[in-house]
């Protein structure tokens, strides 16, 4: 396969259309929104989204400051990015190696572990802000 072609999911080759300038910006945004739409299809992401909403409500109740909201939002954006990467890893492994293999399982487990680390970081920070405000504020 040469640089001008790519293989679609059904195995057929289609030409790659490279956009330039402002059209490239809009195309890139379209791809990003497509990724976000795909990510919303993941149950784990929807659970993380609900947890973020609950944390934001809790932050309002305890009177968190702007810095704490921004830090929580940044942690959540990182978690979204890791969840997207993990989903991409899972899709690639499933496409390349539909049979169960140790390497494929390890790749999926490592991606899942990365997500778990960010979930724990988000939870720890949210609990820190909530309890710090409640007991020291």
Curated annotation (Swiss-Prot):
Cellular compartments per GO CC: plasma membrane
Gene3D superfamilies per the UniProt record, alphabetical: 1.10.287.3610
Residues the record lists as binding a divalent metal cation: 42, 90
Principal subcellular localisation of the protein: membrane
Transmembrane portions of the chain: 45-63, 69-89, 113-133
Class in the EC hierarchy, top level: transferase
Entry's Gene Ontology molecular function annotations: ATP binding; ATP-dependent diacylglycerol kinase activity; metal ion binding
Protein name per its UniProtKB record: Diacylglycerol kinase
Organism: Rhizobium meliloti (strain 1021) (Ensifer meliloti)
Gene: dgkA
